């Protein structure tokens, strides 16, 4: 019977070992040994008189397989799973036609009134015509201001979305276009003169697009963010105080609504927006939608710790508790409005947290007590 050869046991070795043979598959199977290490060079060379010892058998053979790199191709845009077809909007047609009919009816009524006044007296007709012209001119100015406010709000939304894309794509040309438009947008604000000068000096430098957006955020938004935080904190404190001392629930609801509307308008004007009545309605709707998306007034651990850490959980009355909750709701509304009215997204600067505002609210409450 032939003797069974035991299997080779696994062993470890280094590729720098001179006894390891490396085989390159691209060279047609040609083999070469690794270069000896420093320790191998330190070995004494064989004497010239003696015969050279036979080379030891290789400990291992390693084949180097080189895989071909796949060609790099630009990624294709994913096809939209849902491709809604824009149909004819009958609702828009209805409201446009209804508005036109109401406008014509109002115009006919005004013209009929002026004709009747002229029939009664020349003086009354003249006064009626002047009043009608004043009313029409005032209405045109109001409509123009509303349209101007909506346009500025739309520009803020576009700047915010474009800056967010630049932070992802690092497009320098788009970043410079955004900065130039932002400088024109914030030009009326004298508080940002130093930041505008700094950006004008660095706008043509060799800077990545994302870094340029971050520079603009630090130079233009830092001071505005501090003022916005003060506005939100003061509004939350006022709501908390009035809710705690008001005798009627209806007064609480009205004051919270008025304070929230006023706060949103102040934040919009702080960041460069000039919303009118329609603009405020749009901002209120967007703020409520933003709150619904982000989870409403969800309290984090830091917020709960700030509330419980002041010992209020055991000694808060019902009205005082309502005041604190309404104050936190106002602060949450302010933070949501801050996200919507800010021309640049938060990236280089820290986003204000609800916990910090709640801590300020608790400190104010302790002073009042």
Curated annotation (Swiss-Prot):
Q: How does it sit in the membrane?
A: Multi-pass membrane protein
A Pfam family this protein belongs to?
DUF697
Q: Which UniProt keywords apply?
A: Cell inner membrane, Cell membrane, Membrane, Transmembrane, Transmembrane helix
Q: Low complexity: which segments have biased composition?
A: 34-51
Keyword Transmembrane helix assigned: yes
Membrane-spanning residues: 90-110, 124-144, 239-259
Region of interest (Disordered), residue spans: 1-61
Please, which domain of life does this record's source organism belong to? Bacteria
Name the InterPro entries on file.
DUF697, UPF0283
Q: Which family does it belong to?
A: Belongs to the UPF0283 family.
Name the record gives this protein = UPF0283 membrane protein RPA1583
């Amino acid at each position: 019977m032939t003797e069974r050869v035991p299997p080779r046991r696994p062993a470890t070795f280094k590729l720098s070992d001179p006894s390891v043979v490396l085989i390159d598959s691209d060279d047609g199977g040609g083999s070469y040994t690794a270069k000896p290490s420093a320790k191998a060079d330190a070995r004494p060379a064989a004497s010239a008189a003696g015969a050279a010892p036979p080379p030891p058998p290789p400990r291992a053979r390693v084949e180097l397989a080189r895989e071909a790199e796949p060609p790099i191709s630009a990624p294709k845009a994913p096809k939209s799973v849902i491709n809604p077809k824009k149909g004819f909007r009958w609702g828009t047609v209805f409201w446009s036609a209804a508005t036109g009919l109401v406008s014509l009816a109002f115009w006919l009524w005004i013209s009929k009134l002026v004709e009747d006044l002229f029939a009664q007296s020349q003086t009354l007709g003249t006064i009626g015509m002047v009043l009608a012209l004043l009313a029409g001119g005032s209405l045109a100015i109001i409509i123009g201001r509303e349209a101007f406010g909506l346009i500025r709000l739309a520009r803020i939304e576009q700047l915010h979305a474009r800056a967010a894309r630049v932070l992802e794509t690092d497009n320098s040309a788009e970043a410079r276009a955004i900065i130039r438009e932002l400088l024109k947008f914030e030009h009326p604000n004298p508080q940002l003169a130093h930041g505008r000068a700094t950006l004008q000096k660095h706008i043509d430098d060799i800077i990545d697009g994302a870094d340029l957006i971050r520079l603009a955020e630090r130079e233009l938004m830092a001071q505005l963010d501090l003022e916005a935080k003060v506005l939100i904190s003061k509004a939350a404190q006022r709501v908390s105080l009035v809710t705690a001392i008001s005798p009627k629930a209806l007064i609480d609801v009205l004051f919270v609504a008025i304070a929230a509307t006023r706060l949103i308008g102040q934040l919009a004007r702080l960041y460069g927006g000039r919303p009118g009545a329609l603009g405020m309605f749009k901002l209120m709707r967007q703020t409520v939608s933003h709150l619904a998306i982000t989870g409403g007034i969800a309290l984090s651990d830091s917020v709960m710790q700030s509330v419980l850490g002041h010992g209020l959980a055991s000694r808060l009355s019902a009205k005082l508790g309502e005041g604190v909750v309404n104050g936190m709701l106002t602060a949450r509304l302010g933070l949501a409005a801050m996200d919507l009215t800010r021309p640049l997204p938060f990236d280089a600067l820290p986003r204000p947290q609800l916990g910090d505002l709640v801590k300020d609210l608790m400190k104010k409450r302790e002073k009042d007590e």
